[in-house]
UniProtKB/Swiss-Prot annotation:
Organism: Wolbachia sp. subsp. Brugia malayi (strain TRS)
Similarity field: Belongs to the universal ribosomal protein uL24 family.
Domain of life assignment: Bacteria
Pfam families: ribosomal_L24
MF terms (GO), sorted A to Z: rRNA binding; structural constituent of ribosome
Entry keyword set: Ribonucleoprotein, Ribosomal protein, RNA-binding, rRNA-binding
Subunit structure: Part of the 50S ribosomal subunit.
Biological function: One of two assembly initiator proteins, it binds directly to the 5'-end of the 23S rRNA, where it nucleates assembly of the 50S subunit. One of the proteins that surrounds the polypeptide exit tunnel on the outside of the subunit.
Gene Ontology terms: cellular component: ribonucleoprotein complex; ribosome
Organism lineage: Bacteria, Pseudomonadati, Pseudomonadota, Alphaproteobacteria, Rickettsiales
Protein's UniProt name: Large ribosomal subunit protein uL24
Listed GO biological process terms: translation
Length: 105
């Protein structure tokens, strides 16, 4: 089965403290039937790092994973949240935005 959200996609957060923010998917994390995505600038937490040989310690801002159900792909034409469908064009399976019909990616 093809994934509806892939790394590199522009997404918008639907729920949570970062609701309405837009970011790019950096990485998709799959662990035991839970699919999560790491999105740039979304769900940022502070991590306290101890100083080690070669690097100084301090407070590092780190993006944590957010559940796939809490984000939606942005329509490339209207810049609005959209659902994703699949269709075959020239014997290639492609994703398209259901709002505008534009091909994604």
């Amino acid at each position: 089965m093809s994934a509806k959200i892939r790394s590199g996609d522009d997404v918008i957060v639907l729920t949570g403290r970062d609701r309405g923010k837009i970011g790019k998917v950096i990485k998709i994390v799959t662990c035991s039937a839970k699919r999560k995505a790491v999105v740039s600038g979304i769900n940022v937490h502070k991590k306290h790092a101890k100083p080690k040989a070669g690097s100084s310690g301090g407070i590092i801002n780190k993006e944590l994973a957010i559940d796939i159900s809490n984000i939606a792909i942005l329509d490339p034409k209207y810049k609005a949240p959209t659902r994703v469908g699949f269709k075959v064009i020239d014997s290639k399976k492609v994703r398209f935005a259901k709002v505008s019909g534009e091909v994604i990616g």
